[in-house]
């Protein structure tokens, strides 16, 4: 289906709450593209806020590890976003046990992910929904941070925010506690959980609901206390919690048997309970984990199937 002089929609490849995604072609280059058609008719006041956010933030960012917004056009009263075509995602790769990947491959994927996240944070943008199926692969093996439907500008210190963001399994403890003020540290927590999942090849903190998510998180990583996170006990739900000790280093070694000491340091830095002590994207990128052998794989050499 020809949608304007420059683009053709070829087949539907996905559908979400506010958009339908088509595989398409850019005529002038022959390039494969994805066309995200925003369902404006679904919303009485016009565009859904998620669509507005996605357009706003993708227009502001150009980076090799962030999905590229190529163009925007209107057709039949619908807004269409033209995005680079990214054939698969990290969730598919983790789940497909026929795909074998190495510690060097994981290191390459983490490096690309953190470069994309750092670019967001450097531009004062919180992603707020980092998870494996929002990390997409380009045909040459680059990981691209995608889906900015929950993104927002990093807030002023006293600005009140919703804590109902980030897919549950990747939600930082401050969000689980219902914090109304938070920082880019929420994205780093999500990356830490993704790293653990890559090493285990199963979900690391799979809570069944919001209450169970707290139980699962603190059973795995220890219940935070005022000693390591001042005033954490002032959150309303804190007194209902079971107190679990943090895992010992030996317990972490047994859980993550292929992880080096630097890899465990790297993971623990991202999964620090106190958001003010949690590593930043810069600290992650400067970690000894990336300096030790093996070096990160060349992304184009990693064999993944679509």
Swiss-Prot record:
Impact after mutating residue 163 to A: Normal growth
Residues annotated as the enzyme's active site: 129
Locations listed in the record: Nucleus
Biological process per Gene Ontology, one example term: cell division
Molecular function, one GO term: protein kinase activity
Catalytic activity, as annotated: [DNA-directed RNA polymerase] + ATP = phospho-[DNA-directed RNA polymerase] + ADP + H(+)
Disulfide links within the chain: none
Outcome following mutation: residue 17 to E/Q/V: Normal growth
One Gene Ontology term, aspect cellular component: transcription factor TFIIK complex
Residues at which ATP binds: 13-21, 36
Effect of residue 162 to S/D/E: No effect on kinase activity
Domain Protein kinase span(s) in chain numbering: 7-290
Highest taxon in the source lineage: Eukaryota
Pfam families, per the entry: Pkinase (PF00069)
PTM comment, free text: Phosphorylation of Thr-162 regulates the affinity of interaction between CCL1, KIN28 and TFB3. Thr-162 phosphorylation does not vary through the cell cycle and is necessary for full kinase activity.
Keyword list, A-Z: ATP-binding, Cell cycle, Cell division, Kinase, Nucleotide-binding, Nucleus, Phosphoprotein, Serine/threonine-protein kinase, Transcription, Transcription regulation, Transferase
Residue numbers carrying Phosphothreonine: 162
EC number, UniProt record: 2.7.11.23
Biological role stated in the UniProt entry: Catalytic component of the TFIIK complex (KIN28-CCL1 dimer) which is the protein kinase component of transcription factor IIH (TFIIH) and phosphorylates the C-terminal domain of RNA polymerase II during transition from transcription to elongation after preinitiation complex (PIC) formation, thereby positively regulating transcription. TFIIH (or factor B) is essential for both basal and activated transcription, and is involved in nucleotide excision repair (NER) of damaged DNA. TFIIH has DNA-dependent ATPase activity and is essential for polymerase II transcription in vitro.
Subunit structure: CCL1 and KIN28 form the TFIIK complex, a component of the TFIIH holo complex. Component of a complex consisting of KIN28, CCL1 and TFB3. Interacts with TFB3. Also interacts with HNT1 and HOG1.
Further comment found in the protein's record: Present with 4400 molecules/cell in log phase SD medium.
Similarity comment text for this entry: Belongs to the protein kinase superfamily. CMGC Ser/Thr protein kinase family. CDC2/CDKX subfamily.
Name this polypeptide is given: Serine/threonine-protein kinase KIN28
């Amino acid at each position: 289906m020809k949608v304007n002089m420059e683009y053709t929609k070829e087949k539907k490849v996905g559908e979400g709450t506010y958009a339908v995604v088509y595989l398409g072609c850019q005529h002038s280059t022959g390039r494969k593209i994805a066309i995200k058609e925003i369902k404006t008719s679904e919303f009485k006041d016009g565009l859904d806020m998620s669509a507005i956010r996605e357009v706003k933030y993708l227009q502001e960012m150009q980076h090799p590890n962030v999905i590229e917004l190529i163009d925007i056009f209107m057709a039949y009263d619908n807004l269409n976003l033209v995005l680079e075509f990214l054939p698969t995602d990290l969730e598919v790769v983790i789940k497909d046990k026929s795909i074998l990947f190495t510690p060097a491959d994981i290191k390459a994927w983490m490096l690309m992910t953190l470069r994309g996240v750092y670019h967001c944070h450097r531009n004062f943008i919180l992603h707020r929904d980092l998870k494996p199926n929002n990390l997409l692969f380009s045909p040459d093996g680059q990981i691209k941070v995608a889906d900015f439907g929950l993104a927002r500008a990093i807030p002023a210190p006293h600005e009140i925010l919703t804590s109902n963001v980030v897919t549950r399994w990747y939600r930082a403890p401050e969000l689980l506690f219902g914090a109304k003020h938070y920082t880019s540290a929420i994205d780093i927590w999500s990356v830490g959980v993704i790293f653990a999942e890559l090493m285990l090849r199963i979900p690391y903190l799979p809570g069944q609901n919001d209450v169970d998510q707290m139980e699962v998180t603190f059973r795995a990583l220890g219940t935070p206390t005022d000693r390591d996170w001042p005033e954490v006990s002032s959150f309303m739900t804190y007194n209902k919690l079971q107190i679990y000790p943090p895992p010992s280093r030996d317990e972490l070694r047994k859980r993550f048997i292929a992880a080096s000491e630097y890899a465990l340091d790297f993971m623990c830095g991202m999964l620090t309970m106190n958001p003010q002590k949690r590593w930043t994207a810069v600290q992650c990128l400067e970690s000894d984990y990336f300096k030790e052998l093996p070096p990160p794989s060349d992304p184009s050499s990693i064999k993944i199937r679509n």
